């Protein structure tokens, strides 16, 4: 009887997972050395908007799961493409993660037509150190890499 009750409680959660709104997932190399990647989660019904997500980790590691991938379903349900950036650690050179973020924005814009994204509706967000990176890109990036929001 307990198993039946547990199954009845778990079934809606399993169905919710099966009803995920992500249509396509792509992984793109974002740096010449291959250490930086961009994982793109495209929604079934695109709104034309995309967000580059920079997970945090104190510039010593990255919290890719709970500050990156776990947000894909939330954004995709709203028709927003989520692009989770695995940026390289600075190791004394602040330009390393900045260049990874610049490349990510440029990649999203360059692929906009193929991914059903408006190239003038690309934003950036981040958590902790990733939030610092996102704000630095928003205020210091050259025009081609500056996010729209």
Name each region found by the language model:
Residues 1-4:
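Positively charged n-region of N-terminal signal peptides that target proteins for export
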Residues 7-16:
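Bacterial N-terminal signal peptides
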Residues 20-49, 94, 98:
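N-terminal cap/lid segment of alpha/beta-hydrolase-fold proteins
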Residues 48-56:
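Short beta-strand element of the alpha/beta-hydrolase
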Residues 50, 76-83, 123:
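A fold-wide structural signal in alpha/beta-hydrolase
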Residues 56, 80, 87-89:
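Active-site loop/turn elements of alpha/beta-hydrolase fold enzymes
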Residues 63-70, 85-119:
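Catalytic nucleophile-loop/oxyanion-hole region of alpha/beta-hydrolase
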Residues 103-149:
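Primarily recognizes the serine-hydrolase "nucleophile elbow" in alpha/beta-hydrolase
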């Amino acid at each position: 009887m307990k198993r039946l009750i547990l199954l009845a409680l778990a079934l809606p959660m399993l169905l919710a997972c099966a009803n995920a709104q992500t249509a396509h997932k792509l992984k793109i190399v974002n740096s010449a050395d291959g250490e930086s990647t961009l994982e793109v989660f495209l929604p079934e019904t695109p709104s034309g908007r995309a967000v580059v997500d920079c997970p945090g980790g104190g510039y010593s590691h990255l919290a890719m799961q709970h500050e990156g991938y776990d947000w894909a379903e939330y954004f995709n349900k709203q028709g927003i493409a989520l692009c989770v950036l695995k940026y390289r650690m600075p190791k004394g050179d602040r330009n390393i993660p900045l260049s990874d973020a610049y490349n990510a924005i440029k990649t999203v814009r360059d692929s906009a037509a193929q991914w059903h994204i408006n190239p003038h509706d690309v934003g950036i967000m981040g958590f902790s150190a990733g939030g610092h990176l996102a704000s630095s890109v928003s205020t210091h990036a050259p025009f081609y890499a500056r996010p729209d929001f």
